[in-house]
């Protein structure tokens, strides 16, 4: 029943009003439902709401009530702000829009009053509130469902901890959150994920036609644990490479698998980001797909944001229809595009051609080079101009069988928030870090698996950590994780010799202070909760 979140959310609307969850300050201290009063709460609706917080702005569709005040609904989208905070701040993405907060992301000058960071913080804390509410009301009803909601809550807490470091923490809907350090949150997350694993469903790859598609199972738990362990040295000061490798290996050996066979003139990699990705074998790569449907599950801030926000009307990304742009009608917002540093990961000689995406990846000899260079410059000399920089044609609403989307405006493309490829690169990186900075034969094989899926060259000798840092970018650009990876490789804030165009607000790129590796606690949060203190440097 998950493919259409809305069917089950709408009956819960009255309940969300009781929750008072519009959370203008986004804190975790939201008024709970009193079960003695609200005896008709739709628990399935609340269960779905916990998942849907990552895919929808609020109750109803794209233009319905938003759960976060102070920004328009599309801007508060979970994926939109995951992208903005973790991609616009890095060597991958830049945006020329004038919305308040975009430039300070791009130039690494964000602070405690940043509207989009504060919106993402509110989105995460509101999602935690929904999970706490469900567990308080239905925690003993169904062990598997409760374990899933505990996972969703842990994922929200992970993102909050990764972004803001020292964060408000509570498991009760009615208590004022205490502040916990990153190291404390790490310890809680590790124990929580290990604790819920037995109650989660067995790891089983699924398509949208299978029961449970859109819900997490043991494999998602293993992948989040492997991510936690991979970043342990940043979070706690102590590395956990062996555990990262072990949990990544569990995912690799599960029934989830890399999509390796293309269809209908599309590559296997492209299929992961298309309008029928839940219906094709691409779905078997997704450990947590966020469901989208152009008719029933609509959002301005999820897949459509990554499709429309990266296209202008002159781009054509369909090799089978040279008049089509991106598979949605008249949704070409032309904002987010590549920094030259991303393109150079595929064209190290600065010789990226001016071609459409379906010819670009052939020239790159790598299916992941889904860039449009027609009439564009490689450099971002004029940040406000969309053609100043190569465009990204990675996300579309096209379908492998050539059929039309369910709706002209909104996308059917599910967003694969967790996918198997992460396990391969986690395994390889942990392997290299355990082996003096170069992969052993099994780590080499893990990188080769990722590269051969993309028809890129492979090797028999080792991959270095530098190679792996670049491979994270090639495989996952624009998927909302680059900031985390750069920090782990000491290439983000602080004095390091890794620069990119416009890093720190300088065209040539310059270092910025290490305190920016952690975002600022929103000012209004500090006012609302006396338990919180601001992060250092802000």
Regions found by a protein language model. Give the residues of each.
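Extended ligand-binding clefts on enzyme/binding-domain cores
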Residues: 258-387
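Flexible, polar/acidic helix-loop-strand segments at domain edges
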Residues: 97-119, 337-419
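Long, intrinsically disordered, low-complexity segments
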Residues: 23-27, 40-43, 94-95, 124-125, ...
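Membrane-proximal, proline-rich intrinsically disordered regions
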Residues: 24-78, 530-538
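Short coil/turn linking the two alpha-helices of tandem helical-hairpin repeats
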Residues: 161-168, 231-237, 435-437
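Conserved, well-structured interaction surfaces
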Residues: 44, 48, 52, 57-58, ...
């Amino acid at each position: 029943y998950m493919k259409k979140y809305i069917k089950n959310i709408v009956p819960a609307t009255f309940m969300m009003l009781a929750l008072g969850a519009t959370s203008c300050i986004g804190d975790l201290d939201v008024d709970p439902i009193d079960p003695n009063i609200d005896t008709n709460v739709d628990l399935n609706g609340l269960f779905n709401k916990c998942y849907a917080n990552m895919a929808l702005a609020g109750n109803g569709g794209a233009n319905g009530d938003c759960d976060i005040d102070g920004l328009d609904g599309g801007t508060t989208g979970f994926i939109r702000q995951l992208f903005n905070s973790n991609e616009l701040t890095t060597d991958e993405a830049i945006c020329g829009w004038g919305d308040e907060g975009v430039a300070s992301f791009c130039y690494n000058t964000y602070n405690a009053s940043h509207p989009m960071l504060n919106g993402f913080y509110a989105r995460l804390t509101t999602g935690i509130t929904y999970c706490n509410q469900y567990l308080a009301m239905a925690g003993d009803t169904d062990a598997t469902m409760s374990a899933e909601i505990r996972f969703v809550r842990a994922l929200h807490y992970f993102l909050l901890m990764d972004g803001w470091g020292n964060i408000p923490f509570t498991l009760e809907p009615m208590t004022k959150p205490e502040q916990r350090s990153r190291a404390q949150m790490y310890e809680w997350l590790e124990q929580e994920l290990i604790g819920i694993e037995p109650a989660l469903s067995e790891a089983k790859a699924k398509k949208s036609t299978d029961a449970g598609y859109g819900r997490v199972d043991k494999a998602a738990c293993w992948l989040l644990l492997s991510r936690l362990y991979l970043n342990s040295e940043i979070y706690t000061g102590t590395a956990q490479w062996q555990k990262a490798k072990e949990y990544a290996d569990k995912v690799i050996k599960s029934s989830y698998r890399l999509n390796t066979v293309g269809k209908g003139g599309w590559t296997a990699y492209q299929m992961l980001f298309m309008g029928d990705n839940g219906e094709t074998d691409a779905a078997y790569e997704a450990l947590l797909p966020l469901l989208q449907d152009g008719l029933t599950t609509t959002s301005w801030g999820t897949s459509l944001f990554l499709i429309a926000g990266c296209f202008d009307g002159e781009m054509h990304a369909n090799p089978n229809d040279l008049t089509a742009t991106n598979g949605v009608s008249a949704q070409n917002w032309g904002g987010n595009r590549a920094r030259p540093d991303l393109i150079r990961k595929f064209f190290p000689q600065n010789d990226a051609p001016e071609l459409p995406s379906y010819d670009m990846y052939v020239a790159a000899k790598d299916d992941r080079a889904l860039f449009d260079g027609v009439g564009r410059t490689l450099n971002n000399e004029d940040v406000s101009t969309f053609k100043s920089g190569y465009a990204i044609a990675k996300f579309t609403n096209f379908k492998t069988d050539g059929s039309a989307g369910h709706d002209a405006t909104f996308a059917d493309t599910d967003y694969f928030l967790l996918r198997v490829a992460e396990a391969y690169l986690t395994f390889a990186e942990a392997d290299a870090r355990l082996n003096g900075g170069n992969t052993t034969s099994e780590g080499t094989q893990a990188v080769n698996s990722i590269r051969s899926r993309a028809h890129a060259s492979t090797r028999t000798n080792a991959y270095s950590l530098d190679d792996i840092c670049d491979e994270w970018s090639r495989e996952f650009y624009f998927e909302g994780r680059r900031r985390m990876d750069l920090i782990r490789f000491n290439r983000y804030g602080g004095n390091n010799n890794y620069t990119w165009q416009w890093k720190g607000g300088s065209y040539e790129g310059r270092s910025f202070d290490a305190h920016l590796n952690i975002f600022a606690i929103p000012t209004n949060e500090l006012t609302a909760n006396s338990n919180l203190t601001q992060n250092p440097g802000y």
